[in-house]
C-alpha cells in the first residue's frame, strides 16, 4: 500500500509531500503522530512504575496519584462518577476486554496523559473529557452507546492526538471547543490531530470544531454517518485530508447551529455514496511530519486497525 510522508508545508491551498512505500498498518504505524508530538511530546507514564488494577477503588487511587505511572486496567471497572486522571499517566487496557463503564475519564488541568486500548460503554457524562490540558494522546479505544460526548476536548486544551479509535452506535462523537464565547481561552489553542478513527454509524461531531487552527483530520473512515461528518465553526481552521467517506450525505461543512462558519480546506478525500461537502477559507500550516495512507485504501486500513485489541 502506498503512503506519503507529508512534511506539512500547508498554506491555504498548497501541500508539499514526499512519497515512500510501506506494506500495511503495523505496530510501527501505531506510534504517536500529529499534535501530540508537539509542545514537548507525549510520553505518559513512560519511565515510571506500572500497576495493574481490576476494581474502581484501586483505579481511582492510581489515577489521582502524583507519580509518573502506567496503569494497566484488567476486566471491567464501573465508575460512579467521572474520574480525574493526573499528569504523567498512561492508562491502558489489558487485552481486548478491559472496559470503563458507568462514567468516564476526566483529564483536567493535566499534561502528558495517554489513554489506550479501553472499551467505554454506557457512560453517563462524557467517556473522555479533556479540559485545560496539554500533551494528550487518546488511541485505540472502542466507544459505544453513551450519553453525551465520546471524546470531548475543550477549555484551552492543546497539542492532542486522537487516533485509531472506533466509535459506534453513538450520537455526539468528538467535540473540540465547547462554546462560541470562550475565545479568550481558546484562541491559539485547541490544536488537535484526528487520524485513523472509525466512525461506524454515528450521528454528528466528527469533530465539531471551534477556534482550533490548524486542526488536522486525516485518514479517518466515516461509514454511514447520519447527520454530518466534520464541522468547522467559530474562527476554526480545519484541514480535512484523505479521509474515506461512505454513505455519508454531509461529509463536512462550515458553520453549525448558531455557530458561524470557520475555515475548512478539503483535500483528496475518497467519496463513496456521499455528498461533496462544503469548504472555504484558509488553514494555518501543519508543523509536523506524518504518515498518510492511500485515500482509497483508508477503509481497509482503519477497519483492520482501529479499536481495542491491537495494542496493550
Description of each model-found segment:
Residues 1-70, 275-312:
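Extracellular "leader-to-stem" segments immediately downstream of a signal peptide or signal-anchor
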Residues 38, 43, 78-83, 232:
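Short aromatic-glycine motifs in intrinsically disordered, low-complexity regions
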Residues 60-67, 75-92, 98-117, 121-134, ...:
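Extracellular beta-strand-rich solenoid/capping regions of secreted or surface-exposed proteins
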Residues 88-94, 111-122, 132-147, 157-178, ...:
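Right-handed parallel beta-helix
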Residues 104, 126-127, 150, 173-175, ...:
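Structural detector of coil-to-beta-strand junctions
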Residues 107, 130, 154, 186, ...:
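Residue-level marker of regulatory loop/turn positions in helix-turn-helix DNA-binding domains and
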Residues 209-213, 218-222, 226-312:
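Extracellular beta-rich repeat passengers
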Amino acid at each position: 500500500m502506498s503512503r506519503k510522508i507529508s512534511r506539512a508545508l500547508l498554506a491555504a491551498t498548497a501541500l508539499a509531500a514526499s512519497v515512500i512505500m510501506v506494506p500495511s498498518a503495523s505496530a510501527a504505524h501505531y506510534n504517536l503522530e500529529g499534535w501530540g508530538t508537539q509542545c514537548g511530546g507525549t510520553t505518559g507514564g513512560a519511565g515510571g512504575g506500572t500497576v495493574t488494577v481490576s476494581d474502581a477503588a484501586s483505579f481511582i487511587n492510581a489515577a489521582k496519584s502524583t507519580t509518573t505511572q502506567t496503569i494497566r486496567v484488567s476486566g471491567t471497572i464501573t465508575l460512579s462518577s467521572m474520574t480525574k486522571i493526573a499528569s504523567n499517566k498512561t492508562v491502558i487496557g489489558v487485552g481486548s476486554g478491559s472496559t470503563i463503564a458507568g462514567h468516564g475519564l476526566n483529564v483536567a488541568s493535566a499534561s502528558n496523559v495517554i489513554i489506550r486500548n479501553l472499551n467505554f460503554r454506557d457512560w453517563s457524562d462524557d467517556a473522555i473529557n479533556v479540559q485545560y490540558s496539554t500533551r494528550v494522546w487518546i488511541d485505540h479505544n472502542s466507544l459505544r452507546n453513551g450519553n453525551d460526548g465520546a471524546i470531548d476536548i475543550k477549555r484551552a486544551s492543546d497539542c492532542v492526538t486522537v487516533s485509531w479509535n472506533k466509535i459506534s452506535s453513538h450520537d455526539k462523537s468528538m467535540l473540540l471547543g465547547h462554546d462560541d464565547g470562550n475565545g479568550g481561552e481558546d484562541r491559539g489553542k485547541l490544536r488537535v490531530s484526528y487520524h485513523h478513527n472509525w466512525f461506524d454509524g454515528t450521528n454528528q461531531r466528527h469533530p465539531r470544531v471551534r477556534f482550533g487552527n490548524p486542526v488536522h483530520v486525516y485518514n479517518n473512515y466515516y461509514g454511514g454517518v447520519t447527520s454530518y461528518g466534520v464541522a468547522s465553526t467559530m474562527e476554526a481552521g480545519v484541514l480535512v485530508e484523505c479521509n474515506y467517506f461512505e454513505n455519508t450525505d454531509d461529509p463536512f461543512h462550515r458553520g453549525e447551529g448558531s455557530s458561524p462558519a470557520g475555515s475548512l480546506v478539503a483535500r483528496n478525500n475518497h467519496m463513496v455514496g456521499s455528498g461533496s461537502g462544503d469548504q472555504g477559507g484558509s488553514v494555518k500550516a501543519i508543523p509536523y511530519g506524518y504518515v498518510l495512507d492511500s485515500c482509497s485504501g483508508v477503509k481497509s486500513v482503519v477497519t483492520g486497525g482501529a479499536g481495542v485489541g491491537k495494542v496493550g
